[in-house]
UniProtKB/Swiss-Prot annotation:
The name this protein goes by in its record: Fructose-1,6-bisphosphatase class 2
Enzyme class, broadest EC rank: hydrolase
Consequence of gene disruption: Cells lacking this gene are shown to be highly attenuated in a mouse tuberculosis model. However, another study shows that in a mouse model of M.tuberculosis infection, cells lacking this gene are able to replicate and persist in lungs similar to the wild-type strain. The mutant cells grow on gluconeogenic carbon sources and have detectable FBPase activity, due to the alternative FBPase (Gpm2, Rv3214).
Top-rank taxon, per record: Bacteria
Length: 362
């Protein structure tokens, strides 16, 4: 009706004419969990932030687990932990197989590492992060058979030349060519472990530079995929759970990771073979996380190449997070300001701040 109460106007009639109807979207946008999920890693980082440099890995990790477990049950999803703190008998919370979320929303695989780099956190060193990944139910690789895998990761521009079965020297040269760099311009990120002595020797023989990290190869893999990070390639053996979480991030960024399972001993090798795993198979990014709707969130605990750590001010703190979604390709960097006195009024998590001080607005 028009404002005067008479019949339909010409414009109103036209709006109902099928020839004037806008083409509908192919599908309604599904619920974007990213902003809900980042609250979980923020909570983990803020809880662990109180333990930085105190020499207690278990204390810091436990605080992060408690905080994340409390927050994750407010997230609109029906999640199952596929990568968590271990088996139920050894992990009271966030154990493998635990159901998480508020019971509404999509069915999801949930992978979490409350602190990637517990040693880094306990010593106050750089690059400790709180991290999680979510994907469609049944799309994450089962990491239970073999604890370690050999990995190589690179960003989108060189994803098509990666070959974990080739010598590292060939991979370095191939990536350098695609990126229009000299081999001597390349930087390879490697975990500083005795098992990597030959790998380090081979990389040095090419003339490429090396960045050795003591822990935290999830952050290292992400750095290899981000432009202007100073890292061009990640290589070496690290944890299988961390490899799957890194693959979720890499799916969102369009990079590539390849991996092969690396049993520690004959017993683990037999376990993997009996479970039907092919130890010679090259696992691609899509093999590790096959879903089309993947979310990844990380919040810095200590300062690092990727994220700033938790910073405390009178009455509050700041957190720095990265949030990614594969379906949209969106990568968000979020700097959040938290007034701890306000949080403690309603939160079951004790973030313990000076409630009498002035809140630091941005």
């Amino acid at each position: 009706m028009t404002a005067e109460g008479s019949g339909s106007s010409t414009a109103a009639v036209a709006s109902h004419d099928p020839s004037h109807t806008r083409p509908s979207r192919r599908e309604a946008p599904d619920r974007n969990l990213a902003m809900e999920l980042v609250r979980v890693t923020e909570a983990g980082a803020m809880a662990a932030g109180r333990w930085v440099g105190r020499g207690d890995k278990e204390g810091g990790d436990g605080a992060a687990v408690d905080a994340m477990r409390e927050l994750v049950n407010s997230v609109s999803m029906r999640g199952v932990v596929v990568i968590g703190e271990g088996e139920k008998d050894h992990a009271p919370m966030l154990y493998n197989g635990e159901e998480v979320g508020n019971g509404d929303g999509p069915e999801c695989d949930f992978a979490v590492d409350p602190i990637d780099g517990t040693t880094l956190m306990s010593k106050g060193m750089t690059n400790a992060i709180s991290v999680l990944a979510v994907a469609d139910r049944g799309t994450m690789f089962d990491p239970s058979a073999v604890f370690y895998m050999n990995k190589i990761a690179v960003g989108p521009d060189a994803a098509h030349v990666l070959d974990i079965t080739a010598p590292i020297s060939e991979n370095i040269r191939a990536v350098a060519k695609v990126k229009d760099l000299s081999v001597r311009d390349m930087t390879v990120c490697i975990l500083d472990r005795p098992r990597h002595a030959q790998l380090i020797h081979d990389v040095r023989a090419t003339g490429a530079r090396i960045r050795l990290i003591t822990d935290g190869d999830v952050a290292g893999a992400i750095s290899a995929c981000r432009p202007h990070s100073g890292t061009d390639l990640l290589a070496g053996i690290g944890g299988t759970p961390e490899g799957i979480i890194a693959a979720a991030a890499i799916r969102c960024m369009g990079g590539a990771i390849q991996a092969q399972l690396a049993p520690r001993d004959d017993a683990e090798r037999r376990k993997a073979l009996e479970a039907g795993y092919d130890l010679n198979q090259v696992l691609t990014t899509e093999d590790l996380v096959s879903g089309e709707n993947v979310f990844f969130c990380a919040t810095g605990v200590t300062d690092g190449d990727l994220l700033k750590g938790v910073r405390y001010y009178p009455g509050g703190c700041t957190t720095h997070s990265i949030v990614m979604r594969s379906k949209s390709g969106t990568v968000r960097m979020i700097e959040a300001y938290h007034r701890l006195s306000k949080l403690n009024e309603y939160s079951a998590i004790d973030f313990t701040g000076d409630s009498s001080a002035v809140y630091p607005l941005p």
